[in-house]
């Protein structure tokens, strides 16, 4: 989404922003990264979708990109990865996840549970648009954003593992012969 990419680039000008099909990009580029964060589209997994289908009577399959990414990274990625999504309306068939707030996070490293604000969605919205008459102007992309404290927590867990791994690799390289 060009609009989301432009806003991200505005907020984080030192980051490299790639506008592409993230699912396809991941498949061909995952080996290039020490840490991968994925957040595939969630509307078809959401508990809200379950009720929407019951009301509108329009059946919709869950988007399997979520499971494709988890399975693929779990089998082939040597780096660290975390895939975030909403709590689904069904029982996940891959139960190795961490539940934090309104999120399930599948990963290949430990992510300790932290307390999230009870009204996490409202808290996030107030952070970006405040309260009052303009709060309803919140875009879907902003509403779907992961709480920044949760994102930082997951990143810190990954960075800690990367630093430990790199320190260990460094010691094993020079430790035996010196």
Pin down the residues of each PLM region.
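Conserved active-site and SAM-binding loop architecture
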Residues: 1-178
